[in-house]
Amino acid sequence: MAASSSGEKEKERMGGVSGMTGLGSTRERLLSALEDLEVLSRELIEMLAISRNQKLLQLEEENQVLELLIHRDGDFQELMKLALNQGKVHHEMQALEKEVEKRDSDIQQLQKQLKEAEQILATAVYQAKEKLKSIEKARKGAISSEEIIKYAHRISASNAVCAPLTWVPGDPRRPYPTDLEMRSGLLGQMNNPSTSGVNGHLPGDALAAGRLPDVLAPQYPWQSNDMSVNMLPPNHSTDFLLEPPGHNKENEDDVEVMSTDSSSSSSDSD
């Protein structure tokens, strides 16, 4: 009787537990079903052991415990199927999460490329607006084609793209000497022995005239007097260089009279 009463109490407890199993998650329900199966199996084994030792038949109680065990096993199998389905769904969710991460990475890459393209387009639009402003400004201050052609002809005629620092309107000089100017210069005459002025000497006619050749002509007005004086030939006589101080015509007459007297006295002595 004690065994039967304990079995009834166990059944009531198992019934209460089985009623509470529908409230939790699948994992909790599986654990609860396993605990119920463990308790029922232990109870059934104890009942079989007691009946064998006492040689008492308790078929009704054993059948009830066995039915509960079979019922809980069915619940456990259903929960296992549910868990397997949920496991498949979980794997699908993980695969979808990986796909979402991949798509998110692709979207971020595309977003980065779109930002770069936006920056490039913004720069291009800004430059285009600046060009349009320049075009509009050029249209407002347009220059006739004839003036442009004249200016281009003037540049091409001078064979130059940059004028000297001292260049003024009307100055025909170029920023560099031409081949003809180089040949007619001092260096060209030094390299050519057939011309006068070889070995660095100036032509005789230029020295005799007291002037400089065109190659050595001063470029500035303040240089003309100094360079003319410095470049005079050695045999060129000037009053301010060769005549001593106080020299005049009367001194010359006195010298001539003295020379005449000395010559006459020498003739008388003879």
UniProtKB/Swiss-Prot annotation:
This is Mediator of RNA polymerase II transcription subunit 4. Its main location: nucleus. The gene is Med4. The keyword Nucleus applies. Pfam families: Med4 (PF10018). GO terms for cellular component: core mediator complex; mediator complex; nucleus. GO terms for molecular function: nuclear thyroid hormone receptor binding; transcription coactivator activity; transcription coregulator activity. GO terms for biological process: positive regulation of DNA-templated transcription; positive regulation of transcription initiation by RNA polymerase II; regulation of transcription by RNA polymerase II; transcription by RNA polymerase II. Component of the Mediator complex, which is composed of MED1, MED4, MED6, MED7, MED8, MED9, MED10, MED11, MED12, MED13, MED13L, MED14, MED15, MED16, MED17, MED18, MED19, MED20, MED21, MED22, MED23, MED24, MED25, MED26, MED27, MED29, MED30, MED31, CCNC, CDK8 and CDC2L6/CDK11. The MED12, MED13, CCNC and CDK8 subunits form a distinct module termed the CDK8 module. Mediator containing the CDK8 module is less active than Mediator lacking this module in supporting transcriptional activation. It comes from the Eukaryota.
